[in-house]
Amino acid sequence: SDVYKRQEHDHEGRVLTLEYPEFYLVNCYTPNSQDGLKRLDYRMTWEDAFRAYLLELDAKKPVILCGDLNVAHQEIDIKNARTNRMSAGFTDQERAKMTELLAAGFTDSFRAIHPDEVKYSWWSYRFHAREKNAGWRIDYFIVSNRIADKIKAAEIHNEVFGSDHCPVELDIDL
């Protein structure tokens, strides 16, 4: 059952859900598939259970999901697409799960506002990746389709340092 699946995954403490009168705010740190894709199978199971959870919430009221989803969804979301095809966070399987999430009734807020903009939210500490802007867009605000028209702005603040990630912002009029 879905409850069992959530209990199976809950011990890692990756999801925090806040209920507001008009919407749910879900913060998530998606499992990384790791070097050698050691956790890819677990990740696929987790993605299905998490999507089912979001759909349960969405049946009650709109959902705003934010967090490190550990996937660069499209080639525009990663600097070196060709050389990262089998890297954790850019496998066909992980990207397909993001496609499934969006197809289930959700909108990538940054892409909705900036369909062609190349901007990243994460850079490896290795190889001076941030200096070279060799990054990945793996941090998102995803919203229920029925509130997507209320998005006023969606930004990535890559001018902010202090982490291998930078802040992402959503301005939505609910």
List each language-model region with its residue ranges:
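Short helix-loop capping/hinge motifs at secondary-structure junctions, enriched
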Residues: 25, 147-150
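Surface polyanion/phosphate-binding segment centered on an Asp-His-Pro turn
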Residues: 155-174
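Short, small-residue-biased leader/transition segments that mark boundaries at the very start
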Residues: 1-4
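Short Gly/Pro-enriched turn/cap motifs at secondary-structure boundaries
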Residues: 6-8, 130-133, 158-161
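Beta-strand-turn-beta hairpins that frame and shape the catalytic cleft
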Residues: 13-29
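Metal-dependent phosphoesterases centered on the DNase I-like endonuclease/exonuclease/phosphatase
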Residues: 46-134, 138
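Surface-exposed cleft-lining segments at the edges of enzyme active sites
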Residues: 6, 31-47, 82-86
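Short hydrophobic/aromatic beta-strand or adjacent loop that forms the aromatic wall/cage
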Residues: 12-17, 137-139, 165-169
